[in-house]
């Protein structure tokens, strides 16, 4: 896939794979990269390092995903690539992880991708 000139959104861009993806898209010639994460300060650090734009977003909240898509579209005048990367892990095991944590894992690791697809597709 040709990345040069593309407008890209990366969720989970505050650290790890998301940060690496933001850098990779930038290095491959993306025209603009939005770095989205619930941890705004670290997303801003990533964005600053690549001349991108940071947006705070809890991807487990459908309204925040819609806002992310709108703000990204406004800043970049469109979105060519939406990299839905954000994810979280549970505790040590099934019994040690609270029901509330499982709900959060479900929202972020599963539903966030549904919310993103609904928000970004025409």
Residues covered by each model-derived region:
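Substrate-binding pocket helix/loop in short-chain dehydrogenase/reductase
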Residues: 93-94, 101-106
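Canonical Rossmann dinucleotide-binding motif of NAD(H)/NADP(H)-dependent dehydrogenases/reductases
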Residues: 3-32
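The beta1-alpha1 cofactor-binding region of Rossmann-like NAD(H)/NADP(H)-dependent oxidoreductases
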Residues: 40-41, 57-67, 99
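A short, exposed helix-loop element centered on a Lys and neighboring polar residues
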Residues: 117-118
């Amino acid at each position: 896939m040709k990345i040069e000139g593309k407008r890209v959104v990366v969720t989970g861009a505050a650290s790890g794979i998301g940060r690496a993806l933001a850098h990779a898209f930038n290095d491959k010639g993306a025209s603009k990269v939005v770095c989205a994460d619930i941890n705004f300060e670290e997303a801003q650090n990533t964005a600053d390092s690549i001349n991108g734009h940071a947006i705070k977003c809890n991807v487990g909240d459908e309204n925040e995903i819609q806002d992310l898509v709108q703000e990204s579209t406004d800043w970049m005048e469109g979105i060519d690539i939406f990299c839905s990367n954000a994810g979280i892990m549970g505790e040590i095991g099934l019994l040690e992880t609270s029901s509330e944590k499982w709900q959060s894992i479900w929202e972020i690791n599963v539903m966030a991708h549904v919310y993103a697809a609904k928000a970004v597709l025409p």
